[in-house]
Every structure is written in C-alpha cells, then in structure tokens.
C-alpha cells in the first residue's frame, strides 16, 4: 500500500481490456478512487479492504489462492492520495485460460463483503492491521507523515501540537457495526472500473457491460479512461 500520485481525473466505471491471445497470464484489477464523507468512513473502508485482500487471512487469499489455486498473490489495495481520498481496489494475476472465472470471483468477494457476510474474527484482525499500519507509517515513513500534515495545515503550521485525526478515527471504528454498515461503506459494484491486461476477450463480459473499452496495443491506459469518462459525462 505505497503512496501514489493523485490521478488527474475521477476514474470512470466499466471495463478496460487489453487483449493478448498469446499471453499465459492475465492481470485483473477492480477498483476506483473514492472520496469519503468522513475520516471514520475512510477507516471503515480501509478495514473492509484489508478483510477482502490483505494477507494470508483475507478472503482473496483463502478463495483465490488456497481453494482455487489460481493466483500466487491476490490482494487488495488502499492508498491514501489526499484528505479523505483514496485509491482502492482488488487485483490478481491469473492464468489467461481462467481469468473470467477469477474475475467473477473477485466481484463475489466484494459483493459478499459489502452485504455484511463477514466473520467477526476476520474483521477484528483487519482492523488491527489498519491500526498497526498507521503506527508503522508514523515511525518509518516520514513522507506519509508530511503529506498528512500538509492536508491538515496547507497554509501555516499549528501553534499547538499536531493531531492526525485519521488515527483517532481509525481507533474509533466499531468492528461490531461493520457488517450492518458495509453496504453503505463500499461502492456499488456498478461504479467500479475493471482493468484486464492479457487473455482473450470474453464476449459475455463485453456484452453485459454498459461501458466497455478495448484498449488498442501500444496505446496508454489513459486512452480508455478518457474515452469512458467522456461517454459517462454525457449521460
């Protein structure tokens, strides 16, 4: 979950596919850039993304790696890129002959988490991971601390002590309430962007998607992002 640069525009929804019929592996990413209503909303979302795909206890590891043996390192991503703003998603590199199966499973994991079908133990472990990660950032990542400082005090430094409210909000997350709140915490799947690199085109996914862009070879990803954004802005 390294720091990344803020994208120049809001990510559209839909599917972007760079087809490669000769590839043996396919990279799948499903996610978005999300603005949060509050810092506690951000901390709750971070906890649920940790539950979905962070480490050996996550749903992605259990289902995609252990049960399906389809990917060595399926994972979730949650990178803060501004005040109450984060780049988040799920990713996996899988065999090209079964990418569409795992693609559907990744949506199942997102949807089940969003519907609150989550274990209490798993949520507690994920919340602990969020807290430990914040503490680690404070100790070992001065660039992370500087960015959070500038978000809170863009014009001048405080006269008193610095209070990083995100840490307080993360401690205030009520794990026992997450399952009931999950449907309002995570984005509706129709609002996510899917990026698929490699493998053959799946006609069903192309047909079912209201927003589909086949990325031409040698074109940057921005080509499809702008195309989808333009179409959706006209709706």
Language model features with spans:
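A common structural junction motif
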Residues: 1, 108-117, 210-220
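Glycine-rich, charged/polar anion/phosphate-binding loops
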Residues: 11-17, 73-78, 178-180
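A short, acidic, amphipathic alpha-helical segment used as a generic capping/interface helix at domain edges
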Residues: 173-185
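Non-catalytic accessory/interaction domains
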Residues: 76, 195-234
């Amino acid at each position: 979950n390294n720091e990344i640069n803020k994208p120049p525009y809001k990510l559209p929804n839909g599917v972007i596919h760079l087809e490669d019929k000769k590839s043996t592996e396919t990279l799948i990413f499903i996610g978005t850039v999300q603005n949060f209503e509050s810092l506690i909303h951000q901390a709750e979302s971070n906890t649920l993304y940790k539950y979905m795909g962070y480490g050996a206890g996550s749903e992605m590891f259990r289902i995609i790696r252990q049960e399906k043996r389809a990917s060595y390192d399926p994972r979730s991503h949650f990178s803060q890129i501004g005040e109450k703003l984060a780049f988040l998603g799920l990713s996996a590199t899988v065999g090209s002959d079964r990418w569409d199966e795992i693609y559907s499973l990744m949506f199942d994991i997102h949807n089940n988490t969003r519907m609150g079908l989550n274990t209490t133990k798993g949520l507690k472990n994920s919340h602990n991971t969020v807290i430990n990660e914040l503490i680690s950032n404070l100790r070992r990542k001065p660039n992370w601390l500087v960015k959070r400082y500038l978000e809170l005090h863009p014009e001048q430094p405080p006269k008193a002590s610095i209070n990083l409210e995100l840490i307080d909000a993360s401690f205030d997350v009520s794990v026992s309430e997450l399952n009931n709140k999950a449907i309002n915490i995570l984005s509706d799947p129709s609002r996510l962007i899917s990026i698929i690199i490699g493998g053959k085109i799946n006609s069903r996914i192309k047909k079912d998607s209201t927003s589909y862009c086949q990325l031409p070879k040698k074109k940057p990803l921005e080509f499809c992002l702008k195309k989808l954004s333009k179409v959706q802005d006209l709706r």
